[in-house]
């Protein structure tokens, strides 16, 4: 099990972004599947990426259309994009088997939360500095309502998600961030940039950066 040197802990990291509009969903998926220019990715390593659900944007969008109810609000959240990773230091020590288990457990957490058929895309990115899982889910309730609020609305729900997610990967030597800490808002783009800076600059991720809230066009963060 990977362990950090000294008193430095390794953390489970989860962020999400709400997507409204089919164009926004398709654009995010194209980035995920490397079907558009991705400056932060190393093209030579892109073949190391792999997906476990849909194989392309077209397939994923087809699954989205199948799930979406015909009647929905114009401003409804159609999908939620997740980025799931761990402290950069953890990846340096984790074995290939441990890394594979991290991705499997992360996807299983999403399936348990939303339902397996609601996870329309799950792609492991190894062509960036810090490996991570990018996943897309349709926030459809069991009774057929489209409701992101029911799944990720409210701070108590978000804290619960952070705790249960960290618990799901705890056996891999990862911890949850400190509850009640404060962090600034980041856009998903900035978060991807911070992921990629992590390994190159060997920046440690503090627990204070892991306590979230949800913004419509951002990621889990806190005021």
What label would you give each PLM region?
Residues 1-223:
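N-terminal nicking endonuclease/strand-transfer module with a His-rich metal-binding environment
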